[in-house]
Amino acid sequence: MERTRNILGIYSGGISRIPHLASFLPGEPVRLSPYKTIPEQVNAIAVWGHRPSAKKPVALAQSVGLPVIRLEDGFIRSLGLGVQGCPPLSIVVDHLGIYYDASVPSSLECLVKDNDGNKPLAAEAQAMMRAIVDNDLSKYNQAPPFVAPDIMPEAVLVIDQ
């Protein structure tokens, strides 16, 4: 049977419970069981980053030659924490790797490196960066505004995922 529709297999109950999941994905999400064969209509397997729970679905995808799509919280995740039930505003969908794993290229890395190909996106990216700064947006948008004291000793900024 020929695969014409984009159907993404998902083994994770956590992923399948994400509100409005289909609106973030390049295909229709379908919940799969690790105890049954992958339906022929499935075009790829979606997993959450490099979580330990992704290992078996990745192995199953590789065993039948299907690509793996890695998902992760978007850089602006939500208006609160996901564990508190706040739905995501963005999800990273990566067909190559995932942005925090430097051992393999990611879609984001390739986009950044492709200076000629991403020129049409430059103005939009500048506008989005300005909006993030102007509106004090953060990943979860929960931190109180930071105002540095007039006299502040030298500091080291530590950036974490």
Descriptions of predicted regions:
Residues 1-161:
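Catalytic-core helical/loop segments in enzymes performing group transfer/polymerization on anionic/lipid-linked
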